[in-house]
Regions:
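ATP/NTP-dependent adenylation/nucleotidyl-transfer catalytic domains that generate, transfer
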Residues: 7, 15-18, 23, 159, ...
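Enzyme catalytic cores with a strong preference for nitrogen-chemistry domains
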Residues: 1-354, 370-379, 411
Length: 643
């Protein structure tokens, strides 16, 4: 099973200019390498059979005859291979010459796509030799003794996979053919190119490819000429680039004097999901040509023992790399802007935050402090309330108080033990029974205190609950589930931890830094059950519901891409290889889906809060789900997974 992945390759062979039979030998070698690696579709550079830099030799019948003969020999020599192959070759039709992409598989040519936009400026003179696809009248072409489909609007389809083709300059125009092809159904675009190197051009090219793949919500496979092309005036560095929906999946090294084979997988299931969800995608169909694209069917082989070569990020919510600082600051800016607007609109004089010494309340307090700074309001008007209860440990209590003081926030301590004991007497509950009533009473008592203090001080209660807790329903209904504005509702637990650590290392003084780092290292817990005999946290959330890094991974792929459970399991196996065994992944995947469906009623009445990332559970925006939906289909699929 390949879970919607199509293994593709961009090949950059060594060439000798005008030596067609040498060139097809190199092409065949790369085809066979790709076949051994399970590649299903492989693309070669523009005019790869002859070399791009033949120039006026393209007017020579000897070269054109040789190119056609070499093409037919290549098709025949590789008849036993299953992979669909796309090569560039000059072909004659209607007494004209076209710069063509020829598609073939298992000894048969499937179709021919001529280049549409022929550059004729500066170093490019393609109109000197070639005719644009727009000038052609015929829809077939003769190669050897056979006729084959020809046109710039050919699509190649196998099941849910639909491939479209454009050639080099086609990508660089305002409305590339790929834009039209994707609206006709193409989900992978192959670009056969011969793009010479200039200072700064590669960065622009990479950006162009990623942007086009994002605009088209498609995979994009780009193969450009490399070593062996004439260096009379130009240098070709050999670019193999594979992108998917704006993300760069794989790229070849440039300026190598060896052949290149760049392989990755395009996830057509997630692309289909994105197109279905983003209903704006098909608005451009009104501008399509009246004649529909011609579809050529082929069969893509699904190899046994499918393996994924593309990386799978185990922490898809957390930023990394060069954009780290910018991304973290952007997240805080969104949270601050949302809270600032609400405070101003409500004419609030204070903000009330319950501080437990845990990650979520810490992040909420940091956001509130930044908001008051942005509004030029004194931090002392923020009221940080610590409410020690039956399960509060010295570590979390001390961290809560130290953090509030170090940030210049007003500290208020309201113990809740006596109030809860009175409540237990009122409802006739035995306090030695540590059940759901025992736990939730504490959460609701704290929320009541926060709400009343906010009313008393003309303030807003700032919610602390995060996206992961909302997904799992790990919150007390009308307890910590409720607030007047929730700043963390779109932030998953793995990102909460990351943001707090980032602030500790970059934004605060040493005193606050030490406190924040200790909070990061504290086990995640609601602290509703008394501590153990040593005064340490006894109730650890991840022991009860599972590791948050797994749940955040499940959540991301379920909501962002609409992935089904068995695919999420497959991806998690790769992402967490060596960290969690298969049985553990399956166990917590089942827990995730069971709880996600059971706990929707809590998400149906969430407080307002800003959307930060692409995944959100707001019932007013991103996630509208009935509270009584049944999880049977999802859970039964998980049960069928073989470990």
């Amino acid at each position: 099973m390949n879970y919607g992945f199509v293994k593709v390759a961009a090949a950059v062979p060594l060439v000798q200019v005008a030596d067609c039979f040498y060139n097809i030998e190199k092409i065949e070698g790369l085809m066979r390498q790709a076949s051994e690696k399970g590649v299903q579709i492989i693309a070669f550079p523009e005019l790869s059979v002859t070399g791009y830099t033949c120039l006026d030799l393209f007017a020579q019948q000897t070269l054109l005859n040789g190119a056609e003969a070499a093409l037919l020999q290549l098709v025949s020599n590789t008849a036993e291979l299953d992979n669909l192959t796309i090569v560039g070759v000059p072909l004659r039709t209607e007494n004209r010459l076209i710069n063509a992409a020829v598609v073939f598989q298992k000894g048969a040519i499937r179709g021919v796509v001529p280049k549409t936009y022929l550059p004729n400026y500066k170093e490019f003179q393609e109109q000197r030799w070639f005719t644009s696809a727009t000038e052609l009248r015929e829809s077939t072409i003769s190669i050897g003794k056979e006729e084959y489909p020809m046109g710039s609007h050919l699509l190649f389809r196998s099941g849910r996979l639909t491939a479209g083709i454009e050639i080099c300059e086609d990508l660089w125009v305002p409305v590339p053919p790929s834009s039209l092809l994707t609206m006709e159904g193409a989900n992978i675009i192959f670009n056969l190119s011969a793009s010479n190197e200039l200072i700064g051009k590669h960065a622009y090219l990479r950006s162009l490819i990623c942007q086009q793949s994002a605009r088209c919500m498609a995979g994009y496979v780009y193969a450009s000429s490399g070593f062996g092309e004439s260096s009379t005036d130009l240098v070709f560095a050999g670019n193999g680039i594979i992108a998917e929906n704006g993300n760069l999946l794989a790229e070849s090294p440039r300026f190598t004097m060896e052949e290149q084979l760049v392989i990755s997988e395009i996830d057509i299931e997630t692309l289909q999901n994105d197109r279905q969800v983003n209903t704006s995608f098909m608005y451009g169909t009104s501008g399509l040509p009246k004649e529909k694209a011609q579809v050529v069917d082929f069969q893509v082989r699904i190899p046994d023992g499918f393996s994924l070569t593309r990386p799978v990020d185990p922490h898809p919510f957390t930023p990394s790399g060069e954009a780290l600082k910018e991304r973290c600051e952007e997240i805080f800016h969104i949270q601050v802007a949302g809270l600032a607007k609400r405070l101003v609109h409500a004419h609030a004089q204070t903000a009330v935050v319950g501080i437990s010494g845990g990650l979520d309340s810490t992040l909420a307090l940091l956001v509130t402090v930044m908001t008051f700074d942005a509004l030029k309001m004194p931090r002392g008007q923020i009221i940080g309330i610590t409410m020690p209860g039956f399960g509060t440990t010295d570590r979390t209590y001390t961290n809560a108080c130290d953090l509030i003081r170090s940030l210049g926030v007003t500290l208020k301590e309201i113990p809740i033990k006596e109030a809860c004991l009175q409540h237990f007497r009122d409802i006739d509950h035995d306090p030695s029974v540590h059940d759901v009533t025992y736990e939730n009473s504490q959460a609701r008592e704290r929320t009541q205190l926060l709400m009343d203090v906010a009313n008393q001080k003309n303030g807003l209660v700032i919610g602390t609950g995060d996206l992961s807790e909302l997904a799992l329903g790990w919150a007390t209904y009308n307890g910590d589930h409720m607030s007047m504005y929730g700043v963390n509702g779109s932030i998953p637990k793995t990102l909460v931890k990351y943001l707090v650590e980032w602030v500790a290392n970059h934004k605060v003084d040493d005193a606050s830094r030490l406190t924040l780092l200790d909070i990061v290292d504290t086990p995640i817990s609601p602290e509703l059950i008394p501590a153990d005999e040593n005064g340490n946290i006894k109730q650890k959330t991840e022991d009860l519901v599972g590791p948050y890094e797994l749940h955040d991974f499940f959540l991301y792929h379920f909501l962002r891409f609409g992935s089904h459970p068995s695919k999420i399991y497959f991806l998690a196996q790769k992402a967490f290889a060596g960290i969690y065994d298969n049985a553990t992944v399956k166990k917590w995947l089942y827990t995730f889906f069971r709880r996600f469906f059971q706990q929707q009623f809590k998400r149906s009445c969430l407080p307002d809060g800003p959307k930060v990332g692409s995944v959100s559970l707001s019932p007013r925006g991103d996630w509208r789900m009935p509270s009584d939906a049944v999880s049977r289909l999802w859970l039964e699929e998980i049960e069928r997974i073989n470990i």
